[in-house]
Regions:
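Class I SAM-dependent methyltransferase Rossmann-like catalytic core
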Residues: 21-22, 33-65
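Conserved class I S-adenosyl-L-methionine
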Residues: 68-78
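A conserved beta-strand element that flanks and buttresses the S-adenosyl-L-methionine
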Residues: 133
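A short glycine-rich, Lys/Arg-flanked "PGG" loop and its adjoining helix->strand segment in the class I
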Residues: 145-157
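Conserved beta-strand signature within the Rossmann-like core of class I S-adenosyl-L-methionine
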Residues: 158-166
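Conserved Class I S-adenosyl-L-methionine
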Residues: 174-206
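Core SAM-dependent methyltransferase catalytic element
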Residues: 210-237
Length: 237
């Protein structure tokens, strides 16, 4: 089962309020988003309001488990709000990887190091990271065997992999839909079990949920499909 799951929309609102109360909210204001639409800026700003729950959940876990001096790698970091959040919180050894070479943050290059690449052949030294994060990216072009093999390679023993993704307990047929030029999957219960198996075969163990979840109806509607978000956390043994 997942480590955590978004069960109602209020959790998104509450997560954003928490980030704002800690001065850790970096998404554009409504006015900035309006201006971007006016000038037809397809790149958009940092982050996504709908990902507030994922981002805040990940930040809280990192804040509780990872030292400020540890190396943290964010997968699919282009426009990621997590990177500036962690930097503002005091983390100074941040790394990011993305296929988009235009990824830029207003952060000292000694404190954030970006490399162009994909998740399945990362230009990252083995056993160099204490934490790898992936906010809503693994469902695009997903290759479970390749992903967990490579994440396990770059993680130090005891390090964590935190992944949020699109989820619904039963299978949703997305009819070969693609986003960002990549295949897309809404993970279901069977796919999560397979994910756990990929992790186990690469010396990674899932952090179990601390509670049961009352998921009665979808929270997210996107591209004609109804689902929610979930998070799985694994620790390298």
């Amino acid at each position: 089962m997942v480590t955590s799951v978004l069960t109602k929309f209020d959790e998104i609102y509450n997560a954003r309020q928490e980030l704002e109360s800690k001065n850790l909210s970096f998404i554009d204001s409504n006015f900035k988003r309006f201006l971007r639409r006016v000038i037809r800026d397809r790149e958009g700003g940092l982050g996504d309001y709908l990902k507030s729950w994922d981002v805040n959940y990940t930040y809280d876990f990192v804040n509780n488990e990872i030292n400020f001096s540890d190396n943290i790698l964010d997968l699919g970091c282009h426009k990621s709000e997590l990177v500036p959040i962690l930097h503002a919180a005091g983390y100074k050894n941040l790394h990011g990887i993305d296929l988009n070479e235009n990824t830029k943050f207003s952060i000292d290059p000694h404190e954030f190091k970006f490399k162009k690449g994909d998740f399945y052949n990362m230009p990252i030294e083995s056993e160099s990271m204490s934490c790898v994060s992936a906010i809503s990216v693994i469902e695009h072009g997903y290759d479970g065997a390749g992903l967990f093999r490579e994440v396990s390679r770059v993680l130090k023993p005891g390090g964590y992999f935190i992944a949020s993704y699109d989820y619904w307990p039963t299978k949703i047929d997305i009819m070969d839909k693609q986003h960002f030029g990549l295949s897309w999957i809404i993970f279901d219960t069977d796919e999560i079990k397979k994910m756990d198996d990929f992790a186990a075969s690469n010396a990674m163990k899932k952090i179990k949920a601390s509670q049961t979840f009352d998921l009665t109806k979808p929270v997210i509607r996107f591209d004609g499909f109804d689902y929610t978000f979930a998070v799985s956390i694994y620790q390298k043994q």
